[in-house]
């Protein structure tokens, strides 16, 4: 294949696609250049069907530091595990691609996106999503695309497609929307309390832009696309399926309708175990035993899938007996834990999350060093999903992609209502521990996070609640479900999470298993979600009406002082010696920013006060006409040097010791004496002159007489302008 180049202009930037030059051994590959961002995407497929009961799709997004002209940090000076942002981008690409493969497709597929050059104003994430779809579409992999995605901003009442970095900083919306030419199939968003109408309009504007990108892809596929490979799909034996359905469908239907989760799972598993045992015995010696038992498991899964959907669409009955727009029983509690800075426990049916707040000095903020310039991250929301929350055993270790994604969703939802750094100069960390799960645990973590923030005294602008919406669709008719549980999520067509305040939406996330959904479904889902959100907010506000006016006793207190920028080095000292000494002496934590704002943190107010005194002393400046209680530290013939405070000395000239003539400095003061002085002059070099006599009553002038007019009178000599420190 020879190199071919395709060009267009999209959202004000040139979009260039190159095929046939690099990574030619992959099933499909493309280089996408958007602005000055360059992404190489390669897609490959295994030769045979995988043995698992799921589609093994892997999407990677690799950030190479050289792409931004940056040298890797760390000991190895090499890229390591993917950053959080890279992991989230990989998920963002995976989600719209996954529904576009045929039911029963089980070959392993890998899509690897490598960022080769980085332009912060031309999204490499969207270039990678475009490249992923294109590489699959032009390959022989049986992909039913194409799809595409765009970012949408909202600035001054206008929607912007793929906004620049500067536009993102002032945007009220951070939305990624992806889909096919016919419908939206993935949404990820954070927003500053925008209305449902604005969000819906943004989604539709984004989809219009997606259609442009898909049309461009279709041109490229028509020019260089390969013929799709014939692959084996997972099909069950139809005779076996009919036999099992006839014999056991009624038993499974009864089991599915058990309302309580654990009891329902036990009932359905009992039916499955019974069927499995029958067919294991029946085909024990059959040469295709493994295939038959795989078919049995798949048939039972399909039967349960069909019954759950039939109940909802035909009987309008959910597995736990709720109405389609009904929320499970709610409960909320604050101060669940002692000693911590804030805690909230939120329960919705059999889904329960505990959120724990920790406040820290700004020096504890996370430093993020990726392709963007290094920055500090003030707020973190971490989500943990232990296997015991669903009554199972499983792996323990570092958080997986799902946990990272759910944590990021909660972070977006809550960060919109956090106070500014000026209002609340703390680093903030929330940790959500999922204690029970039967669906919508990410939204429970948002509700619990709101409780923890308010209980901990963080002055958030408004409480935030989240709800997960579902969808069951048969192509012609559909049913939107409020507050989906695990079974409805597993067998449903959509997981649409909506979080926000009473004023508007702060976060959205949508994943679907069908090829797309319409504006009508989106509108209905948003309206039902708003009603449910308000119901949850009623509970939160009844539990804790407003953020507490004070922090927890165990939380670090803070005090701030402002110093001149040129004094920062004095407080820090050589190699940090001075500031380290203050910290060691007082036990506080100290942060100093480049503008001279000094923040002092401690749970002990006395320690804060002591540190403030020390710092104030270090940066204190003498002022003309101010009086100081000083100590004599050195004596010279022309005067005495006194220490005003800390490292600031002043010269009291011999003529400023007293109103009477002084011939010998030591006749008036000795080293170690404590005296009151007034500053009378500070020169351009910062040298200070002080006076003792200025604080003493001036003696009356002597009576005039002829002899006093003698030119050689000593008073005449004394009245000559005295020498100062700067003239010595």
Curated annotation (Swiss-Prot):
Q: Which gene encodes it?
A: pnp
One family from Pfam that matches here is: RNase_PH_C
Compartments reported by the entry: Cytoplasm
Cofactor(s) it depends on: Mg(2+)
Xref: InterPro entries: ExoRNase_PH_dom1, ExoRNase_PH_dom2, ExoRNase_PH_dom2_sf, KH_dom, KH_dom_type_1, KH_dom_type_1_sf, NA-bd_OB-fold, PNPase
Name the UniProt record assigns to this protein: Polyribonucleotide nucleotidyltransferase
Q: Which GO terms describe its cellular component?
A: cytosol
Family annotation (NCBIfam families): polynuc_phos (TIGR03591), PRK11824.1 (NF008805)
* UniProt function note: Involved in mRNA degradation. Catalyzes the phosphorolysis of single-stranded polyribonucleotides processively in the 3'- to 5'-direction.
Which family does this protein fall into?
Answer: Belongs to the polyribonucleotide nucleotidyltransferase family.
Q: Per the record, which residues fall in region Disordered?
A: 691-728
Listed PROSITE patterns: KH_TYPE_1, S1
The primary location reported for this protein is cytoplasm
Residues forming the S1 motif domain are 625-693
Specify the species.
Streptococcus gordonii (strain Challis / ATCC 35105 / BCRC 15272 / CH1 / DL1 / V288)
Return the EC number: 2.7.7.8
